[in-house]
Amino acid sequence: MKNKLLKSKDFLQVFDLISSKGFKSNGKYQFQGIDAWHDFDGYTCWLSYKDLTITLLFHGKLGVEYENVDTFDEFYKKINGLIALS
């Protein structure tokens, strides 16, 4: 698996993968430990893993919040793996 620098479109690709292959529970899709959900109009989407949350905003803007660097590293590896599968 090749690690790549992730861009907004990569996170949107992962969001689509999770929402299509995952299962829905309490308004969130779940797949391989990652949750994905969106607001009522779909303009804002979120991905979460442990203490990390990615906010995907309209026009390709994105926000990343996490408490532990290890969580970010784990998430980065998971995302790269999911992108490689799709």
Regions found by a protein language model. Give the residues of each.
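Intrinsically disordered, low-complexity regulatory segments enriched in Ser/Thr/Pro
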Residues: 49-74
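Residue-level signal for functionally critical sites in structured catalytic/ligand-binding pockets
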Residues: 10, 24, 44, 48-50, ...
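Negatively charged, low-complexity tracts enriched in Asp/Glu with abundant Ser/Thr
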Residues: 1-38
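Short, structured protein-protein interaction patches enriched in aromatics and acidic/basic residues
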Residues: 34-48
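Mixed-charge, Lys/Arg-enriched low-complexity segments
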Residues: 70-86
